[in-house]
Amino acid sequence: MDSNHSAPAIVITVINDCASLWHEVLLGIEEEGIPFLLQHHPAGDIVDSAWQAARSSPLLVGIACDRHSLVVHYKNLPASAPLFTLMHHQDSQAQRNTGNNAARLVKGIPFRDLHA
C-alpha cells in the first residue's frame, strides 16, 4: 500500500510556503467535513506532487499548490491527468468550489460547478 499517513485525510503538498494564497480551497474542504493534512516542500512539479499526495492519502485524494496554481489529483487517475487545475487569479468562489469538489470526491457525491 502506498499510503503512509494513518489518519484519513486529503494530503495537501504546499510548495514554497503558499498555503495562505489558497485559503478558500481549504475552507471548501472544511465545509464538506473532510480533514486535510498539509505537508510543506521547498520545490517540485505540481502535477506529480499532487499525484504523490493522492498516493499517500488514505482517502486517495491529493492536492498540490504553488504560488501560481493548484492541482487536485486522484490516486486511480494517470499521474499526468489531474482531476482539477486551478489558477491563482481565479475568483474566491472557484477556489472554494474546488475545495468542496476535492472533498466531494472523497464522499462520492456530485461535484459543484466551479463557477456557480
Curated annotation (Swiss-Prot):
What residues bind Mg(2+), as annotated?
31
Question: What keywords are assigned to this protein?
Answer: Bacterial microcompartment, Chaperone, Hydrolase, Magnesium, Metal-binding
Subcellular location field: Bacterial microcompartment
Q: Where are the transmembrane segments?
A: none
Q: Does the keyword Magnesium apply?
A: yes
Can you cite an annotated GO cellular component?
A: propanediol degradation polyhedral organelle
GO terms classed as biological process: propanediol catabolic process
**InterPro entries registered for this protein in UniProt:** B12-dep_deHydtase_bsu, Dehydtase/Dehydtase_re, Diol/glycerol_deHydtase_re_ssu
Q: Tell me what else is known.
A: Bacterial microcompartments (BMC) 100-200 nm in cross section are formed during aerobic growth on minimal 1,2-PD-B12 or anaerobic growth on 1,2-PD-tetrathionate medium, but not during aerobic growth on glucose, anerobic growth on glucose or pyruvate-tetrathionate. BMCs can constitute up to 10% of total cell protein.
The protein's role, per its UniProt record: Small subunit of the propanediol dehydratase-reactivating factor (DDR), which reactivates suicidally inhibited adenosylcobalamin-dependent propanediol dehydratase (diol dehydratase, DDH) found in the bacterial microcompartment (BMC) dedicated to 1,2-propanediol (1,2-PD) degradation. Reactivates inactivated DDH in the presence of ATP, Mg(2+) and free adenosylcobalamin (AdoCbl), by mediating the exchange of the tightly bound damaged cofactor AdoCbl for a free intact one.
Q: What is stated as this protein's family in its record?
A: Belongs to the DdrB/PduH family.
Record's protein name: Propanediol dehydratase-reactivating factor small subunit
In its UniProt entry, the species of origin is given as: Salmonella typhimurium (strain LT2 / SGSC1412 / ATCC 700720)
